[in-house]
Design a protein with these regions (language model features):
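Substrate-binding cleft of secreted/luminal carbohydrate-active enzymes
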Residues: 45-69, 73, 78-152
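Aromatic-lined carbohydrate-recognition surfaces of secreted/lumenal glycan-active proteins
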Residues: 1-40, 86-98, 127-129
Length: 152
């Protein structure tokens, strides 16, 4: 229902501006627990088929994961078998632990990005970015976000 509403909105807006790309944020739980598709009105296969991008909240601390890297690897395993995932699924990493209100250590965030690149995933980002405190530290992250890193 929400997907169709988004598509209808795009169609209405395209009379004023073309092309219009659509993206939608999805909870990781939708990938990890098929029953939750109904709770959240989200389906990754449906989203990948209908949207230009699906941003998946790959946020292990928000999900209370005991081992964040293992949790992320499992999320990748589950999602990358879905058709169109390699092209259209974007993993949104967390840069802040909202439970403690503290930033995720930049080296940990960087290691997640490196792990994703090693696994062949190039569509990832992070949230939030605090440019006033340089959190996460861009000198460290740019090594993982640069075009040079993508070619390695």
């Amino acid at each position: 229902m929400l997907t169709q509403f988004s598509l209808d909105m795009r169609e209405a807006a395209q009379q004023y501006r073309k092309p219009i790309s659509l993206a939608r944020n999805y909870y990781a739980e939708v990938a990890l627990n098929p029953q939750s598709e109904e709770w959240f009105a989200q389906s990754i296969p449906n989203g990948l088929q209908n949207y230009n991008w699906v941003a998946l909240m790959a946020m292990p601390y928000m999900e209370n994961a005991k081992n964040p890297t293992k949790w992320l690897n499992h999320l990748i395993d589950v999602t990358q078998v879905t058709p169109l995932a390699k092209q259209k699924l974007l993993y949104e990493l967390q840069a802040k632990d909202w439970r403690t209100n503290k930033p995720i250590p930049t080296k940990e965030l960087s290691s997640w990005m490196r792990m994703m690149r090693i696994r062949g995933i190039h569509n990832f980002g992070y949230y939030p970015d605090d440019q006033f405190t340089n959190t996460p530290d861009m000198q460290i992250l740019k090594k993982e976000l640069s075009a040079k890193a993508a070619l390695q």
